[in-house]
UniProtKB/Swiss-Prot annotation:
Zn(2+) binds at C887, C889, C898, H899. Residues 840-853 have a biased composition (Basic and acidic residues). It catalyses: ATP + H2O + cellular proteinSide 1 = ADP + phosphate + cellular proteinSide 2. This is Protein translocase subunit SecA. Monomer and homodimer. Part of the essential Sec protein translocation apparatus which comprises SecA, SecYEG and auxiliary proteins SecDF-YajC and YidC. Disulfide bonds: none annotated. The lineage of its organism: Bacteria, Pseudomonadati, Pseudomonadota, Gammaproteobacteria, Vibrionales. It comes from the Bacteria. It comes from Vibrio cholerae serotype O1 (strain ATCC 39315 / El Tor Inaba N16961). InterPro entries: Helicase_ATP-bd (IPR014001), Helicase_C-like (IPR001650), P-loop_NTPase (IPR027417), SEC_C_motif (IPR004027), SecA (IPR000185), SecA_CS (IPR020937), SecA_DEAD (IPR011115), SecA_motor_DEAD (IPR014018).
């Protein structure tokens, strides 16, 4: 109550931020007349002036009003477009390292130019991050004339660029690129062997476009550079043939319940588990097919790999559906479909053998499982930037997560013109067929009025179902989904024409505005060297059509299902009503929709369905509230999963930083002989401790064992027993010193034989190679540790604490192994000449380049929801007894009055 009153009096936090920024907008506007009077040359000279002022000690905040006024004036001259005041506010929010929530059509791309120009002045580089290559290239080309007018360089960072071109792109003042590519470049740089092979500069400032998509939807997607591991294609194919023989066990409370099924499915957590019957049946099948020994069990240590394959195949068959979760391309490749955007994600693969299992299910060529060589999550990559900001049309629902995980405030930027879109309440039907019939009727009416319609579906399968229904009804339409990715921009350009009907999967086409009346620019682009007269004629024709569409009611949005996240529903709605245009939206739902089926209580579902006739719809505030509650529940669960994933990845992240810093140090150093000398002493002392325990009697020493060990591991044939026999006063300390001195002398002699310069190169090369090999093995060990850690909950231990403790022990082992492996190699290998070192370097570089080609963003599988098994609900084996049924104990009382009270 008091909070509400205070908000009314002093305004919300957002209002207060906007009030502060509006004062600076006035200051920027005051510069406008003076800047309008400048010649082009004088305006261009401002960049040099600002850079000099930074050198003299001025900071970016002091330069902001003049810098923004410069960009606005340059934009008027280059594009004929003047930044609105709200865009200036958006630019200031981005510069402040915050998230600007700007509605669709409010000009986010132009807003970003303000913050990008200002932050590029110190010469450290600005990265503008987009969701795909098309948008990166489009935005870079669109804004290039403006930045170049102001004396700034612009680059594009997209996949498969030659290394010199990529290095040059990173030197640009402003670099546009995709989130995947920036992350992969970071990993590739940390696999390089020479400083000149690296492409990135220090990460100074990033503006993330569609920030919710990249930092939230993609947050569970680790970027992984991997190399092929062992080939087990045959096993996937053989196990795949067994899975169709298994039967699903129905839910206990369903009418057709049978307790003898082989597996259970949990739709909420996307998990599938073998029942006891199922385990026995699978074991029988494996024995029969010669994949397991008679009397053996699936859960014995020797069969861990077999169990992994069975689980992957079961999930592939039961949980992953063709044309919903993935598509199969004409050349037989299984490509993941992003559940959030409906786009395909070529190059991405599910981990844990799931992708191979899906390939076996679809009968296409199975790619080998991969071994991780380097990996990072987007969460940890973007936290490497000194300053991070973002833009999106919908961030407010996830403001808490941005604040919690990235420390980013969200500021809602007001629209330039008031929003007049009519958002109608949801309507709910009994079945999907009734819902589709109502949607088609609505589309017909809109088309007759000449109103364009955009229909949002949640999967490719649903978009094709609806498309077929529209064909039957004789309604012309376009389909925008992952299968027709190439035509995307063309279809979006047409989507605003009178009576145009476009079906879009989720947010395919995001980042491209739907202009009412269609895009006049697209028409102009089709002409060869158009004259000004032709352009004016096209514009005049477009204006007429634009007004006609506005008269008909603007763009009408139809949602065919509620998404798990309110944000994605809001994104669909946000396609309409841009820049104060007319528009409307409505969601059509049915009791068969996934969200309603899983999250609406049985009682409410029965209540709704009992009072409805066929084809009848229901509009109810209670139902809308119930749906929103379900969405909040899912969002909360997804937030917990992402937060948990981050907590686990933070452990690996700290270790990654240490390893990458050590690599940097090794690469930039010309001479690491001091480090090698220290390591040699540590390693030899540790070996001597095993055979000559510190402060022990001579009788406890194992001199023969020590002599053998030094000879075998370090190529040091030392007559230690003879030394001791010859000198009664050779005590432990003196003996240790003598052994180390001998080791140093032998090493120096080896160095003189090939020259110190060759030896320095060889040391560096061996150290880097050993570090990379151990890091790769460490990542695999961390993966295995991670997969089973939740079972510690059974022992009343905190899985997260256990993971931290054990991963720290693994990391300590890595550092110890690094020392001993390097010293062993340097002691035993005989280097003849510099060419050998160079050949070894070249071989390693070739391997790294091959691995870098295996860069892929892997989907964290549903297992990443790391459930603490100790808190799992108990599962009942016998039939559920109704409250009013006779108690099974035979007392004759009702169950609720007998044993039901105890339960």
């Amino acid at each position: 109550m008091i909070t509400k009153l205070l908000t009314k009096v002093i305004g919300s936090r957002n209002d207060r931020t906007l009030r502060r920024l509006r004062k600076i907008v006035k200051e920027i506007n005051n510069y406008e007349p003076a800047f309008e009077a400048l010649s082009d040359e004088e305006l261009k000279a401002k960049t040099v002036e600002f850079r000099q002022r930074i050198e003299q000690g001025e900071n970016l905040d002091q330069l902001l009003p003049e810098a923004f006024a410069t960009v606005r004036e340059a934009s008027k001259r280059v594009f004929g477009m003047r930044h609105f005041d709200v865009q200036l506010i958006g630019g200031m929010v981005l510069h402040g390292g915050q998230i600007a929530e700007m509605r669709t059509g409010e000009g986010k791309t132009l807003t970003a130019t303000l913050a990008a120009y200002l932050n590029a002045l110190p010469g450290k580089g600005v990265h503008i991050v987009t969701v795909n290559d098309y948008l990166a290239k489009r935005d870079a080309e669109t804004n290039r004339p403006l930045f170049e007018f102001l004396g700034m360089t612009v680059g594009v960072n997209i996949p498969n660029m030659p290394q010199p071109a990529k290095k040059e792109a990173y030197q640009a003042d402003i670099l546009y690129g995709t989130n995947n590519e920036f992350g992969f470049d970071y990993l590739r740089d940390n696999m390089a062997f020479r400083p000149e092979d690296r492409v990135q500069r220090a990460r100074f400032f990033a503006v993330v476009d569609e920030v919710d998509s990249i930092l939230i939807d993609e947050a569970r997607t680790p970027l992984i550079i991997s190399g092929p591991a062992e080939d087990s294609s045959d096993l996937y194919i053989r196990i795949n043939k067994l899975i169709p023989l298994l039967q699903k066990q129905d839910k206990e409370d369903s009418e057709e319940y049978r307790g003898d099924g082989h597996f259970t499915v949990d739709e909420k957590s996307k998990q599938v588990h073998l029942t006891e019957t199922g385990q026995e049946f699978v074991e029988e099948l494996l024995v029969k097919n010669g994949m397991m020994q008679e009397g053996d069990t699936l859960y014995s240590p020797a069969n861990i790999s077999l169990l992994h394959h069975v689980n992957a195949a079961l999930r592939a068959h039961v949980l992953f559906e063709k044309n919903v979760d993935y598509i199969v391309t004409p050349d037989g490749e299984v490509v993941i479909v992003d559940e959030h955007t409906g786009r395909t994600m070529p190059g991405r693969r599910w981990s844990d053998g799931l992708h191979q299992a899906v390939e076996a299910k679809e009968g296409v060529k199975i790619q080998n499982e991969n071994q991780t060589l380097a990996s990072i999550t987007f969460q940890n990559y973007f936290r490497l930037y000194e300053k991070l900001s973002g833009m999106t049309g919908t961030a407010d629902t996830e403001a808490f997560e941005f604040q919690q995980i990235y420390g980013l405030e969200t500021v809602v930027i007001p629209t330039n013109k008031p929003m007049v879109r009519n958002d109608m309440p949801d309507v709910v039907y009994r079945s999907e067929a009734e819902k589709f019939a109502a949607i088609i009727e609505d589309i017909k009416q809109r088309v007759e009025k000449g109103q364009p319609v955009l229909v949002g579906t949640v999967s490719i399968e649903k978009s094709e179902l609806l498309s077929n229904a529209l064909k039957k009804a004789g309604i012309k339409h376009n389909v925008l989904n992952a299968k027709f990715h190439e035509k995307e921009a063309e279809i979006v350009a047409e989507a605003g024409k009178p009576g145009a009907v476009t079906i879009a999967t989720n947010m395919a086409g995001r980042g491209t505005d739907i202009v009412l009346g269609g895009s006049w620019q697209a028409k102009v682009e089709k002409l060869d060297n158009p004259t000004q007269e032709q352009i004016d004629a096209i514009k005049a024709e477009w204006k007429q059509v634009h007004d006609q569409v506005l008269q008909a009611g603007g763009l009408h949005i139809i949602g065919t299902e509620r998404h798990e996240s309110r944000r994605i529903d809001n994104q669909l709605r946000g396609r309409s009503g841009r820049q104060g245009d007319a528009g409307s939206s409505r969601f059509y739902l049915s009791m068969e929709d996934t969200l309603l089926r899983i999250f609406t209580s049985d009682r409410m579902a029965a209540l709704i369905q009992s009072g409805m006739d066929e084809g009848e719809a229901i509009e109810s505030k209670m139902l809308s509230r119930s749906i929103e509650k379900a969405q909040r529940k899912v969002e909360g669960r997804n937030f917990d999963i992402r937060k948990q994933l981050l907590e686990y990845d933070d452990v690996a992240n700290d270790q990654r930083k240490v390893v990458y810093e050590l690599r940097d140090e090794l690469m930039s150093a010309d001479d690491i002989s001091d480090m090698i000398a220290q390591n040699r002493e540590d390693v030899l002392n540790a070996v001597m401790d095993e055979y000559i325990p510190p402060q022990s009697l001579e009788d406890m020493w194992d001199i023969k064992g020590l002599e053998d060990r030094l000879k075998n591991d370090f190529d040091l044939p030392l007559p230690i027993q003879s030394w001791l026999d010859a000198d009664n006063k050779l005590y432990e300390e003196a003996l240790r010193e003598r052994i180390i001195e001998q080791a140093v002398e032998v090493y120096k002699a080896k160095e003189q034989a090939v020259s110190p310069a060759v030896m320095r190169n060889f040391e560096k090369s061996v150290m880097l190679q050993t570090l990379d090999t151990l890091w790769k093995e460490h990542l695999a060990a961390m993966d295995h540790l991670r997969q089973g850690i939740h079972l510690r909950g059974y022992a009343q231990k905190n899985p997260k604490q256990e993971y931290k403790r054990e991963s720290f022990e693994l990391f300590e082992d890595l550092l110890e192994s690094l020392k001993s492996d390097v010293i062993t190699v340097l002691s035993k290998v005989r280097v003849q000449q510099q060419e050998e070192v160079e050949r070894m370097e070249a071989q390693r570089r070739a391997q790294a380049e091959e691995a870098a080609r295996h860069a892929q963003a892997q989907h964290a599988s549903a297992d990443d929801a790391e459930q603490d098994e100790s808190n799992q609900p108990m599962v009942r084996d016998e039939r559920k007894v109704g409250r009013n049924e006779p108690c099974p104990c035979g007392s004759g009382k009702k169950y609720k009055q007998c044993h039901g009270q105890i339960n």
